C-alpha cells in the first residue's frame, strides 16, 4: 500500500509517512529511544526503529526535524512533542505513521492490517450485531474480508480516542457507521456517549492490506 493511498485517508493537515527498509536502522535512533528497545527480539527492534524513524521524518515536515520520541511515563504510548498528536501502526511488511498539529485537529489514529479472513468467533468479538447486519446488506463494494476492515476502523478510532479520553475501550464499546460507497465511516461510543468527540475516518484496501484512518476535529 502506497504512502499516497494512506495519505488519502486523512485531511490535508495530517502528514503521513511510510517506513522504508532504511528506517529499520537503529543507529538512527536517539539514545532515549534506543533505551526502550531493551530485550526486544531482532524483528521487533527493526519494527520499532522503523516506526520511530518514519515518525521523525513526518515530524520534520511539521517543523520538528530532530524530535526524540520516548514513551509517556508509566505507559507504552509515544510521547509526542507538545502541540502534536500522532499514531504509529505496523503489520508484516508495512509500517506507517500519521501526525498532525493539535491546532488543526484534536487527535488522529491510523491502523494497517494484513488482508485476510477472520474466524467467526473473532468477528463476533469485533463487530456489534447492527454492524454485521448493515455491512452484510451493503450495496456498495466491500472486500470479502470486510470484518478485518471493521477491525482496522475500530483500531484507528481507538487510537484517536484514547489520548483524548484515556478510556480503555473494547471493540463493542465502539460502533462504526460505514458509508461503503464513499469509503468513509464515523465512530461513536453508544453506551458512553461523548457528543463532543466527533470521530470521522476513511478506509482503503488492496489485495495485501487493509487500512483505516480516523480524526477528531
List PLM regions with ranges.
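Core catalytic alpha/beta fold that binds nucleotide/phospho-ligands
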Residues: 1-217
Amino acid at each position: 500500500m502506497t504512502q499516497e493511498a494512506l495519505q488519502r485517508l486523512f485531511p490535508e493537515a495530517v502528514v503521513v509517512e511510510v517506513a522504508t527498509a532504511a528506517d529499520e536502522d537503529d543507529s538512527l535512533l536517539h539514545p532515549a529511544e534506543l533505551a526502550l528497545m531493551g530485550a526486544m527480539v531482532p524483528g521487533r527492534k527493526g519494527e520499532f526503529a522503523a516506526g520511530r524513524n518514519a515518525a521523525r521524518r513526518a515530524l520534520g515536515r511539521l517543523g520538528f526535524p530532530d524530535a526524540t520520541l520516548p514513551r509517556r511515563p508509566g505507559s507504552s504510548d509515544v510521547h509526542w512533542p507538545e502541540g502534536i498528536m500522532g499514531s504509529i501502526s505496523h503489520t508484516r511488511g508495512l509500517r506507517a505513521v500519521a501526525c498532525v498539529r493539535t491546532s488543526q485537529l484534536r487527535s488522529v489514529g491510523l491502523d494497517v492490517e494484513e488482508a485476510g479472513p477472520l474466524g467467526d468467533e473473532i468477528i463476533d468479538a469485533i463487530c456489534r450485531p447492527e454492524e454485521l447486519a448493515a455491512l452484510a446488506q451493503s450495496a456498495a463494494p466491500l472486500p470479502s474480508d470486510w470484518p478485518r476492515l471493521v477491525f482496522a476502523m475500530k483500531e484507528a478510532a481507538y487510537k484517536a480516542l484514547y489520548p483524548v479520553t484515556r478510556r480503555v475501550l473494547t471493540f463493542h464499546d465502539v460502533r462504526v457507521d460505514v458509508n461503503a460507497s464513499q469509503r468513509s465511516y464515523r465512530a461513536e461510543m453508544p453506551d458512553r456517549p461523548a457528543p463532543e468527540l466527533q470521530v470521522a475516518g476513511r478506509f482503503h484496501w488492496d489485495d495485501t492490506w487493509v487500512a483505516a484512518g480516523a480524526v477528531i476535529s
